[in-house]
Amino acid sequence: MQAVSYFICIFVAQSMIEREMRMTVRFVLLWVLMTVGRGALAQQRIVMPAALKAGDTIAIVSPSSTPDSATVAKGCQTLREWGYVPVVGPHAMNSYHGFAGTADERAADMLWALRDSTVKAILCSRGGDGAVQVLTRIPLEEFRNHPKWVMGFSDATALHSAEVSAGVMSIHCSMCDGISMRGERDSVNAIHRCLLRGEFPTYKIPAHPLNQKGQAEGILVGGNLSVFCGLAGSEYDFLNRADEGLILFFEDTGEQMSKVDRMLHLLEIRGILSRVKGIVVGHFSKYKSPESGFADMYEMLHEYLRHYDIPVCYDFPIGHHSGYNYPFVEGCRVNLTVGQGGGGILQFLRPLRM
C-alpha cells in the first residue's frame, strides 16, 4: 500500500511539474511576443506632422512666461516673410504672477491650437517657466490625435517631451526673438524654414578635445536638462522610450555646476546613460561653479560620460546664448558619427509619412 501511495505521489508531482513548466514556457513565449510587439509598435508610433505650405497658419502660444509684445510682433512679421499666416493665441499676451495667464488659460490656448484644423503648426512665443503646469491639462491623446509641429526650446522642452511621449515629432528651435534675428543667424533660420517644408538637415559636428569617438543610430530626444529631468518617470517623460535606442541631447543656462552634477547622477541611476546610444552636449551658459574643481562644465560632464562607450560631442551650437541654436527634430531617427577629439556628422533620417 505504501509503495502504491509512493508511486501516486511521484506521478502527481511529475504532473504538477510538467504543468508548471508548460505554464512557464507559455508565459515566457507570451512575454517575448508582447515585448517584440511593443518594440515594433514603439518604432511605428512616432509620426511626422505634415509639411507646411505657403499660406498655412502658425499659432503663437505662450505656455510659459509672459512675452514682450514687441518681440511677438517681430516674430509675427518674420513668419509672414516666410510665407505663413501668424495667429496669436487668445491668452498669449496675458500676465498672471509672471506667467502668460493662468495654467488653465495657457492650456486652453494649446488645446485651441491643436484642435483647430486651420492651424498647421504651433510656435511658443518664449521660454521662462510654467509649461509643466500646462501638461496635466492636456491629455497626451490630444498631441496624438492632432499631430502638428510644436516649436520652441528652453521651458518648451516640457511640451516636446509630452509630444514625443504621445508619438509625434516636434522641433526644438528658436522662438519669436531668435527667428527675428538677422546676420549670422540667417543660415539657421533657413534650416528652420526647410524643416517646416519637410526637408531634413545634416549637421557638421564641431571638433572638441573631449569628443568621444563612435557611431550610433537612434531616436533624437532632449532639450533643457533641468526641464526634462523634472519630468522623470511621469507619462510625459520621453526618456521612458530609452529601450528603443535614443540619441540624447541637452543644454542649460544659469544652473549651478553642483545641480547639473545631480541631474547627471539622476540620469545615471535611472539607467538612462547606460542605455542611450549617443549624446550631443549643447551650450551651457551663465553657469555657476563655486569650488567645483573642474575647469568648466564640459569637464564635469566628461567625468560622467567618459565611462560609456558611446559617441559624445560637446559644445554643439544649440541652446541658450549659443549664438546659433540649430533646430533639432525631436523624435526623428538620426545617425551620429563623432571622431575622437575631432568633428563629425549628425544626420536626420527623414521617415516615411505614416
Description of each model-found segment:
Residues 127-144:
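Short Gly/Thr/Asp-enriched flexible loops that form oxyanion-binding sites at enzyme active sites
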Residues 140-162, 169-175:
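Short, acidic/small-residue loops that bind anionic groups at enzyme active sites
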Residues 239-297:
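Internal helical hairpin/lid segments
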Residues 286-354:
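ATP/nucleoside-binding phosphotransfer catalytic cores, i.e., glycine-rich phosphate-binding loops
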Residues 42-118:
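ATP/NTP phosphate-donor binding region
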